């Protein structure tokens, strides 16, 4: 019993250290200063960087000039799926879901560009990077909804009249959503798009089974809103919140997609050089 105060003190230090690491501070997410052993199995690899202090600075931009975005990162924090109501008189509503995917949900190392139009319109175009993650969400009723979280080929614009990137800058636009499964994927009955059986074994191809037998990899469309809330003009860092809406997985065209809404935070760096 005499060791109880020491144990309590040790636990307090441990919990304090964990709180510090996950507090979202700049040190906690500065992966360049951490080793592999510091990051592995901690969840830090799934955390986007943050601007060290709250700031509402500006990054001046000039018309007919292109700026480059690097280290762009998007960290999802909330997931919603639109469910059809039981009562036909009610409207379909988004229901909050619980993410089942562990520590591999963020998009990072994304590159892009921001072009400034003559009227002050800013256009953000995504180029490449780790810009997709397969995620599964659990709904309150027990249904699991897989979807391909991505911002591929995102092109977002602002309202005209901007002479700088500031905390009032909002990029809104569309992006492509590739199929959750590839063309070479085989379902449990060995059916695929370009390989495998044309229809289920020992089951004739009937009209009601046509959609399940005929595999497709449809390209969907999504919308994304990036709301800049923090800008550090000295370092070119920007950060803010995002809201994305996109279709869910269709099981290679076998079922109708559900509408998925994702909310979270983002971070990036803006520079005049590549």
Swiss-Prot record:
Single Gene Ontology BP annotation: photosystem II stabilization
Gene Ontology molecular function terms on file: oxygen evolving activity
Localization per record: Cellular thylakoid membrane
GO cellular component terms listed in the entry, alphabetical order: photosystem II oxygen evolving complex; plasma membrane-derived thylakoid membrane; plasma membrane-derived thylakoid photosystem II
Free-text disruption phenotype from the record: No photoautotrophic growth, no oxygen evolution. Decreased growth rate at 30 degrees Celsius with 25 umol photons/m(2)/s, no growth in Ca(2+) depleted medium, decreased growth in Cl(-) depleted medium; further decreased in a double psbO-psbQ mutant. No dimeric PSII forms, PsbQ does not associate with PSII.
Residues making up the signal peptide according to the UniProt record: 1-28
Membrane topology field: Peripheral membrane protein
A Pfam family hit: MSP
Keyword annotations: Manganese, Membrane, Photosynthesis, Photosystem II, Signal, Thylakoid
InterPro entries from the UniProt entry: OMP/PagP_b-brl (IPR011250), PsbO (IPR002628)
General function of this protein: One of the extrinsic, lumenal subunits of photosystem II (PSII), which stabilize and protect the oxygen-evolving complex. PSII is a light-driven water plastoquinone oxidoreductase, using light energy to abstract electrons from H(2)O, generating a proton gradient subsequently used for ATP formation. Required for dimerization of PSII and for binding of PsbQ to PSII.
Assembly with partners or alone: PSII is composed of 1 copy each of membrane proteins PsbA, PsbB, PsbC, PsbD, PsbE, PsbF, PsbH, PsbI, PsbJ, PsbK, PsbL, PsbM, PsbT, PsbX, PsbY, PsbZ, Psb30/Ycf12, peripheral proteins PsbO, CyanoQ (PsbQ), PsbU, PsbV and a large number of cofactors. It forms dimeric complexes. Contacts PsbQ.
Family the entry assigns: Belongs to the PsbO family.
Protein name: Photosystem II extrinsic protein O
Gene name tied to this protein: psbO
